[in-house]
Amino acid sequence: MSSLSEYAFRMSRLSARLFGEVTRPTNSKSMKVVKLFSELPLAKKKETYDWYPNHHTYAELMQTLRFLGLYRDEHQDFMDEQKRLKKLRGKEKPKKGEGKRAAKRK
């Protein structure tokens, strides 16, 4: 037996295409490219998209702990204090319909 029949040759090539294998024999340089394309893309690898923790979950958790008095966020405390002092001085943002444009019309 010298080689495969035409039918067997075409079927082997078709099965290689279906199952993501190399259809024709290639050199090592081309096999490197085939190997790169057969791997998952960088964006779909778990270590890439799971690199940073879920910010929304942690922010909600820390805010809940802050309101319960179990966590102290000095920066947020400072911002709240500044907002409170601004309101006492009468410098807070006007409510909707009470701004400069609305005052002109009255």
Swiss-Prot record:
Q: What molecular function terms (GO) are annotated for this protein?
A: structural constituent of ribosome
Say where the protein is mainly found: mitochondrion
Task: Write down a Pfam family by its short name.
Answer: MRP-S33
What keywords are annotated for this sequence in UniProt? Acetylation, Mitochondrion, Ribonucleoprotein, Ribosomal protein
InterPro entries documented for this protein? Ribosomal_mS33 (IPR013219)
Q: Where in the cell is it found?
A: Mitochondrion
Q: What residue spans carry the Basic and acidic residues bias annotation?
A: 95-106
Region entry Disordered: which residue ranges?
Answer: 82-106
Which stretches are tagged as biased composition: Basic residues? 84-94
Q: Which GO terms describe its cellular component?
A: mitochondrial inner membrane; mitochondrial small ribosomal subunit; mitochondrion
Q: Which residues carry this modification: N-acetylserine?
A: 2
> What processes in GO biological process is this protein linked to?
mitochondrial translation; translation
Instruction: Tell me how this protein assembles.
Output: Component of the mitochondrial small ribosomal subunit (mt-SSU). Mature mammalian 55S mitochondrial ribosomes consist of a small (28S) and a large (39S) subunit. The 28S small subunit contains a 12S ribosomal RNA (12S mt-rRNA) and 30 different proteins. The 39S large subunit contains a 16S rRNA (16S mt-rRNA), a copy of mitochondrial valine transfer RNA (mt-tRNA(Val)), which plays an integral structural role, and 52 different proteins.
Give the family, as the similarity comment puts it.
Belongs to the mitochondrion-specific ribosomal protein mS33 family.
Name the chain's protein.
Small ribosomal subunit protein mS33
Q: Which organism is it from?
A: Homo sapiens (Human)
